[in-house]
Amino acid sequence: MEATCRRALEIGLPAIAFTEHADFVAVHEGQHGLDVAGYLESVDRCRARFPELRIICGVELGEPHLHPEAAALVLSAGRIERILGSVHCVTIDGRPRDLSERGLMTTESPPALFRLYLAEVLNLARSGQPFTVLAHLDYARRYWPHDQLPLDEAAFEEEYRAILREAARRGTVLEVNTTRGVEPVRGLCPGPRVVRWWWEEGGEQVSFGSDSHEPGRIAAGFAAAAAGVEAAGFRPAPDPTAYWRR
């Protein structure tokens, strides 16, 4: 985290938001729950060491609508300023599967899995869980076999718009995620077309995330993301740390 703060200052960022994962289903070997106390201590150390950098303390709740008690426990444990809600897993044959699992997204199943994923995101949006930002709305696109089957967002427009309408109704912020830098084929998560649908459905605010996971990737792809979001009808606020608005 300290290396990330140093990198933020090197590239001229006025602020950085740490949004550590709090996932409640162990789908990867060696996966552990979030040590909230240890995380908050690390944030405090960074704030003391880098007073010139605004450091926002956040958390990304994975499928909190399926694990409401565990999610509430995380949020009650300390001072969380920014709460993201996300979906990584879908239920297949009675068990949760993360779409990042190698081979899960095959050319035989992508459309069905994509719809299954978006249906779970809609469940999250409707859940009433206390998250402010909807993170990487179409996380599944990261694992779509783009080299074998082009992803046409228009084929899923109905599912996308149902999520966006519900998110707008509850006042949610839509995150545009660059996945550590915009890869030309995969693109943004979600892409400009979906961000425009967000605007059309009444969405008010947009945030940016690089999902960096390492210091060298923070803010990667933000210039391209900002251009796409601006083209969709959203504008930056005077405060560079604030959400963009319509």
Predicted segment positions?
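Hydrophobic faces of well-ordered beta-strands that scaffold small-molecule active sites
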Residues: I16-F18, I55-V59, I83-G85, V133-A135, ...
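Residues that form or immediately flank small-molecule/cofactor binding pockets and catalytic motifs
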Residues: E60, L66, H88, Y139, ...
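Acidic (Asp/Glu)-rich catalytic clusters
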Residues: L9-E10, L40-E52, A71-L84, R126-Q129, ...
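Divalent metal-binding pocket/active-site signature
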Residues: M1, F24-V25, G30, G78, ...
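Short, surface-exposed, polar/charged, turn-prone segments marking secondary-structure boundaries
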Residues: I16, D44-C46, L84-V87, P110-R115, ...
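Charged catalytic cores and adjacent phosphate/nucleic-acid-binding surfaces used
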Residues: M1, I92, D147-R246
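An N-terminally biased module of ancient metal coordination in phosphate/nucleic-acid-related enzymes
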Residues: M1-P68, E81, Y143-A154, E214-A220, ...
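Glycine-rich, charged/polar anion/phosphate-binding loops
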Residues: E69-A71, V121
